[in-house]
């Protein structure tokens, strides 16, 4: 590492710190046995052990529940209806505590603790109606359906500082701190949903000539009003040449198929839930400093650049291929 202006080092992480820290540098301060040693020949040294101590009380726990179920109804000889529902739910609990004595950062914060709990649930509902019909050498399949996805995320966080240095680590959680009016709580919630309508028609003759047409319409709450719906068709055709009479007696060809297709797909991955809306930050005031017990939050600056033309990213693909086996 390189010492900069005698105030610190440009080291990052425990591994690099372990490599660059002199082996003869003391770990504990001789004058304060409960504190890690920092003053190494005028440099503000942070030992690897101190870096590790900052996370001694950190905990991260994730519980996940996956459920799915469905029903299939045979409405007629060639007509079926299938309805499925699935749920993916996660509960995350993260907590941290840094005592006010051992580490230099803990002393500047007078000890600090945080606790964050979040609940993330995603539901998917699918309903598909399928009609199959075969006659002579013809085979026809028609499918129509809907798919809906909803997602709700919620998070509550709290933090405290000013922990007792007399009874160190006695209460390593939020209850042991005293903020004295400093805001240390936050809450967040976001929701989004997608509604899709699906259709497909597939036809083949004698398993040699195959044609498929697909269409889907997707509407997303992440996109701006008036631009939320996208329409994406696709088509494909194939000719199984190996099924023709002039190749049936060729023993070294099991399958030979010429295929071609064109289609469009929509993408909204990476978009925030409310990117099309103008968002603002919130200013909070410490009433103990302003001497105003009635101090209330005010609207701050802009948090994003709104885009009221936000819509689907549409990509088109064309493919032609020859399958041989």
List each language-model region with its residue ranges.
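Amphipathic helix-loop-helix modules that constitute alpha-helical solenoid scaffolds
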Residues: 31, 37-40
